[in-house]
Amino acid sequence: MIDQEESNFNFNFNQPQQPQQQQFHGKSVKKNKNKNNNNNSESGNKNGGENKNGVEKRFKTLPPAESLPRNETVGGYIFVCNNDTMQENLKRQLFGLPPRYRDSVRAITPGLPLFLYNYSTHQLHGVFEAASFGGTNIDPTAWEDKKNQGESRFPAQVRVMTRKICEPLEEDSFRPILHHYDGPKFRLELNIPEAISLLDIFEETKA
C-alpha cells in the first residue's frame, strides 16, 4: 500500500478547517478587548456547542453501520451515480447524494479525495478531489426534481475537480477495501487507510 507521504496524489487528509466566522471573532478582539473577552467566551461556548451538535447530528442522520466511528477522521468519500446521471456529475463538476446524506457530506473539506461509483456498471471512477466544502443545494438545478422545479433530487453536494484520469476499477479490486453492511452495501464515508488503499490501486491503473 502506498504510504500517504509517498503517494503521487498528495491529498490533504487534514482535520476540518475552522470556519471563517471564528477568524472574524479573533480580529474583533483587537478592536475592543474588554467587550470581546466576554463575547469570545460566550462565542466559544456557543461554537463549541454547535460543533458538538453538528458532529452528533451527522451520526444521527445515518445509521451507525453507514457512518464512520466517532473517533475516525473522514479520509475520503464515495459518491454514487448511474449511467443516466454520471455525465451530469462530470459536466457540472459536482457530485450529489440524496437528502439523508446532507450532514455526512458537510464533513467534506477542500482537497479531500473523492470517488464516483456507477452502480449501473459496478465500476469505481477516480481520482477526484473536493474543490469546495460539502454543502446543501450548491446547485439546486443539478439533477432537478421534475415534480418540484428548483429543487435537486440530490441536494447533498460538493464541487469537484479531476485529480487524475484513471481506468475505472472493477468491484473485485476495490470491494475488499471497503466496509460492508447489510449484504453488498458499502459505507460511503472512508477512513484514511481506506482512502489511501483506493488511491494505491488507482495509482497502479492510471490511464
Swiss-Prot record:
Residues 1-68 are annotated as: Disordered. InterPro entries: Dev_and_cell_death_domain, NRP-like. Pfam families: Dev_Cell_Death. One of its GO terms (biological process) is response to endoplasmic reticulum stress. Residues 8-26, 35-52 have a biased composition (Low complexity). Signal peptide: none annotated. Residues 72-204 form the DCD domain. This is B2 protein. It comes from Daucus carota. The lineage of its organism: Eukaryota, Viridiplantae, Streptophyta, Embryophyta, Tracheophyta.
